[in-house]
């Protein structure tokens, strides 16, 4: 019996923005609930946090090269809501949009199909302060058809 994956099979990797990007206070990014949680004494072993993580924000080109070198053809990553819309709603941060645009372009340049997760448990702290997901208005913001009102 011969086992073979189809030619269009996606071999890839997956990450989450808080767990990989670092640069939690760079280029207009605001705090997420994970920033607050990991900076609360006693919540995380050794007081570790994602402030630097593996610094994907600054090293994404090298990371994508490594993916290409091992013949991955897909990359699932999440967008940090706090990097794109720092206050959770309203003004869009051009530097955040630019980062993800460059990341996607690099993936495509290396024939790596980007798969995007819009939310990976990193609610902006400003929205958590208003009740988080228990606040119906925040749930409605997330599903809003207006790009300025959603992540």
Cite the ranges covered by each PLM segment.
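N-terminal carbohydrate-binding accessory modules
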Residues: 1-59, 63-69
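Glycine-rich, aromatic-flanked loop segments that form ligand/cofactor-binding clefts
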Residues: 9-20, 108-121
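Flexible loop/turn segments at secondary-structure boundaries
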Residues: 19-21, 84-86, 123
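The substrate-binding groove and active-site-proximal loops of carbohydrate-active enzymes
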Residues: 45-55, 82-97, 127-140
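Aromatic-lined substrate-binding rim segments of carbohydrate-active enzymes
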Residues: 64-70, 75-119
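Active-site groove signature of glycoside hydrolases
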Residues: 119-128, 144
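Single conserved hydrophobic/aromatic residue that forms the stacking wall/gate
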Residues: 142-151
């Amino acid at each position: 019996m011969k086992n073979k994956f189809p030619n269009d099979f996606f071999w890839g990797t997956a990450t989450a923005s808080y767990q990989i990007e670092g640069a939690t206070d760079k280029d207009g990014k605001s705090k997420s609930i994970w920033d607050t949680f990991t900076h609360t004494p006693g919540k995380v072993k050794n007081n570790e946090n994602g402030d630097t993580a593996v610094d994907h924000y600054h090293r994404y080109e090298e990371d994508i090269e490594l993916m290409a070198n091992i013949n991955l053809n897909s990359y699932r990553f999440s967008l940090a809501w706090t990097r794109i819309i720092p206050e959770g709603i309203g003004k869009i941060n051009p530097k955040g949009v630019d980062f993800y645009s460059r990341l996607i372009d690099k993936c495509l340049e290396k024939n790596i199909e980007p798969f995007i997760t819009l939310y990976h448990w990193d609610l902006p702290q400003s929205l958590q302060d208003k009740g988080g997901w228990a606040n119906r208005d925040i749930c409605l913001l997330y599903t809003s058809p207006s790009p300025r009102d959603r992540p």
